[in-house]
Regions:
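Serine-hydrolase-like catalytic core of hydrolytic proteins
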Residues: 7-8, 99-284, 334-357
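Hydrophobic h-region of N-terminal signal peptides that target proteins for export
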Residues: 11-18, 564-567
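Sec-dependent signal peptide recognition
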Residues: 2-10, 555-558
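Non-catalytic accessory segments of hydrolases
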Residues: 2, 14-189, 210, 313-315, ...
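A structural signal for well-ordered alpha-helical segments within the folded catalytic domains
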Residues: 50, 107-110, 190-193, 197, ...
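Short, solvent-exposed turn/loop segments enriched in Gly/Ser/Thr/Pro and often Arg
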Residues: 169-172, 219-220, 435-443, 504-513
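Substrate-gating cap/lid region and adjacent catalytic-acid/histidine neighborhood
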Residues: 282, 290-478, 487, 494
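Cleavable C-terminal sorting propeptides in eukaryotic secreted/cell-surface proteins
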Residues: 550-576
């Protein structure tokens, strides 16, 4: 009887909704751009949170400023209310569910949302840590609204941290480049940097500590977090990082010429006719001028389509960060070597790539994805599938499908996360590695080959919102949400996910580790495990060696065959 009462009490307390009274406004705060008021969430015993929604950090990047670096927001006179999301940056929004807020699009979209505790406790006098979150969406979709507001206030901000979410340009707006000053590229990353500058400049007016800023993001937001960790332009703007289910590996960055070529094909598809295509300089000027005149909704549509079609018929491409001479200079190896010396919390879900599969033809789909995400390396893809997948199992068995999907998960996510963790640990930075394993089946998850924690499964436990369906937590959900959010909040506060009263101590990855330990996060089963992904990452070294040996053998055989053919032809001519 007592335990049942405690269970009900836990759910009511942890997920108590804010009062439904008329809108209550916060006291005004004086930001660097003007005076601002937000709205108040009252969670009863959990406390009150001020939500300042849609504060601009940058001017509209439209007209001649489309495809350029962002500019700081203009100041305003008087006092403004910020109680609703600002417009989202343009993207193709498909199948929005009724429980999600309506989306307004505008190129004037560079804004932040700030959630800060309104603490009346006289004992809480210190400045609060700040958690800055970058949303995901494959770099072509999404906005800060997709992670919600009330859940962030209730789950995170009531734990005495300030949370900031932000909009940034996605798709063509965020990554179109000509490789020169006409469209330098990496606009999205420059947006994030400007937002971080805004947070640093305004931290104290919201009660925050500008010397204790944590940057975190999921999926493309995790990749962006890694990119910001490697950029020399962002040093000092944040002090710890937590990339979730995403990092910047070989699939996450490219040369400007690649995107320029694809965008030139797209422009021609839309009607662009260069005057003199042999002149790169002239074509770039004309190309950017043309693309600035295209309706933003049309660019958003084609930016989303570009993930699957490159307008030249040669396969897929992505709108992603590029190497440049400023934000991401040099090679990937040099960028990784120059990663900021800050504490790191990073990890994955147990079956990341499960989110990309239907129930049919799992093996064939896995081969296709593995080939694509190894940049068309069919030999590597097939060798990996042969190594990890037991083909004696029935193709419709859960174990067979798990083995297939884990290979794709490794290629897209796990290998680069593992590499980031080891490389950062070798620089003597404290690194905490995890795998999120908790999963609760719902009607929306029945379309997948099996039930398990997949890409994005963890988000609702941090933010209290699921884009695909209404999130109605039970006791297990509450337990996991409490665990996961506490780990992230502790990391924001102490650069360490362990709290002062943690029952399960989370040890960091050793700087000498070749098989790093990790925290397995699951309901009533969260514990430290000795080897990340059960040693799968080390097995990829064997696979790469096999492939390299096979390629060497093929090259030598081809060379010997050509030499033999040449020798035979020469001998034949001698005796004619």
């Amino acid at each position: 009887m007592h335990s049942a009462w405690m269970a009900v009490t836990t759910i009511v307390f942890f997920y108590s909704r804010p009062s439904a009274d008329a809108l209550t406004l916060t006291a005004p705060v004086k930001t660097t751009h003007g005076r601002a008021q937000g709205k108040v969430y009252d969670f009863g015993a959990k406390g009150k949170v001020g939500a300042f929604m849609g504060i601009p950090y940058g001017r509209a990047p439209d007209g001649e400023f489309r495809f350029q670096k962002p500019r700081p927001a203009r100041t305003w006179r008087g006092q403004r209310r910020f109680t609703q999301y600002g417009p989202a940056c343009y993207y193709l929004a498909q199948n929005r569910k009724e429980h999600m807020p309506p989306i307004r699009f505008d190129e004037d979209c560079l804004s932040v949302n700030v959630f800060t505790p309104l603490n009346d406790d006289s004992n809480v006098k210190s400045k609060l840590p700040i958690m800055v979150y970058i949303h995901g969406g494959a770099y072509v979709m999404g906005s800060s609204a997709t992670v919600g507001d009330e859940g962030i206030a209730r789950i995170l901000a009531t734990q005495n941290v300030i949370v900031v979410t932000l909009n940034y340009r996605t798709g063509i707006f965020g990554f179109f480049t000509t490789g020169d000053s006409n469209a330098p590229g990496n606009q999205a990353l420059w947006d994030m940097r400007l937002a971080l500058q805004w947070v640093n400049e305004n931290a104290e007016v919201f009660g925050g500590d500008k010397k204790n800023i944590m940057l975190f993001g999921q999926s493309a937001g995790g990749s962006a977090t890694h990119a910001l960790l490697m950029s020399p332009t962002t040093k000092g703007l944040f002090h710890k990082a937590a990339p979730m289910s995403g990092s910047t590996g070989e699939n996450g960055i490219t040369q400007p010429s690649v995107i320029r070529s694809q965008m030139l094909n797209l422009a021609k598809y839309l009607g662009f006719k260069p005057t003199n295509e042999s002149s790169t300089k002239d074509t770039n000027i004309e190309l950017v001028s043309f693309m600035r005149q295209v309706e933003p909704s049309k660019l958003a549509l084609n930016g989303a389509l570009s993930v699957n079609y490159n307008y030249s018929g040669n396969g897929q491409f992505k709108l992603i960060p590029v190497y440049d001479n400023e934000f991401l200079p040099g090679t990937l190896e040099k960028l990784k070597a120059g990663i900021h010396d800050v504490p790191l919390l990073t990890g994955n879900t147990e079956y990341e790539a499960l989110a990309f599969f239907g129930k049919e033809n799992v093996y064939e789909a896995a081969i296709g994805m593995a080939t694509y995400y190894t940049k068309g390396d069919s030999m590597l893809a097939k060798t990996a599938m042969d190594y990890f997948v037991d083909k004696s199992l029935p193709k419709d068995s859960v174990e067979f499908m798990k083995q297939c999907i884990l290979v794709v998960s490794d290629i897209i996510f796990n290998k680069d996360i593992y590499s980031l963790a080891l490389q950062s640990a070798q620089k003597k930075n404290p690194v905490y590695l995890y795998t999120f394993k908790y999963f609760k089946p719902t009607p929306a998850t029945q379309r997948y080959p099996f039930q398990g924690a997949m890409h994005c499964s963890d988000l609702q436990y941090l933010f209290g919102l699921n884009e695909n369906e209404v999130y109605e937590p039970d006791l297990d959900d509450v337990i996991v949400s409490d665990q996961l959010s506490t780990y992230f909040v502790n990391f924001a506060k102490f650069s360490n996910p362990n709290g002062q009263n943690s029952e399960q101590k989370w040890e960091p990855v050793s700087d000498e580790a070749t098989k790093p330990q990790y925290m397995s996060i699951d309901v009533n089963a969260t514990q430290l495990h000795p080897v990340f992904m059960d040693g799968r990452m080390e097995k990829w070294n064997e696979i790469n060696q096999q492939v390299n040996s096979a390629r060497t053998f093929t090259r030598v055989s081809t060379l010997l065959l050509s030499m033999y053919s040449f020798s035979g032809a020469t001998t034949q001519r001698m005796f004619v």
